[in-house]
Amino acid sequence: MMDSRLKLIQDWLLQLLAEMTVSDPDGNEHEVFLVDIEVHSNKTIDIIEVFADTDSGISVENCKFLSKHISAELDASEEMQALLPRHFKLVVSSPGLSRPLTMNRQYKKNIGRLMQVTYQNADGEIKTIDGRFISLEEEAEASITLDITKIQKSKPNAKPKPPELVTIPFSQIQKAIVQVEF
């Protein structure tokens, strides 16, 4: 697919989702935001994958609602019909844990979780570290802070280690992925 076509579809979806809200089981409304869109084409069909979220997470029911709404709007839009002249398949889902974080909103909702961050340090070296994401700085130079203190099984009467904190500016982050904890 041409990049300009993808950009037009993405802009259209951003505008469509800009004012969208979904409800949680308690009836509270949550603003939807678009995390990413991927469009794949094969010989007979275009596949549009929409990765959406809310600040409090997104449910399967929310994704089903969004899918129906987006599909109806795509079908009704002459602009989208021109960009998608053949059959398309729409897939709406959460970004999931395997996708890197790309937006401040995603970072905010993951404070306190384990993360793996790949970044370029001041010397130009690419480093990957694991740590507990403890803070997000959005003022001045945006950055995240991780506690990279190794979690070790406690020995009786052992002194806990002081936290070892690493602050990484957003401009140096290449990939940040939330880790699954059991």
From Swiss-Prot:
It is found in: Cytoplasm. InterPro entries: Ribosome_maturation_RimP (IPR003728), RimP_C (IPR028998), RimP_N (IPR028989), RimP_N_sf (IPR035956). One of its GO terms (cellular component) is cytosol. SUPFAM superfamilies: YhbC-like, N-terminal domain (SSF75420). Keywords: Cytoplasm, Ribosome biogenesis. Required for maturation of 30S ribosomal subunits. Belongs to the RimP family. This is Ribosome maturation factor RimP. It comes from Chloroherpeton thalassium (strain ATCC 35110 / GB-78). The gene is rimP.
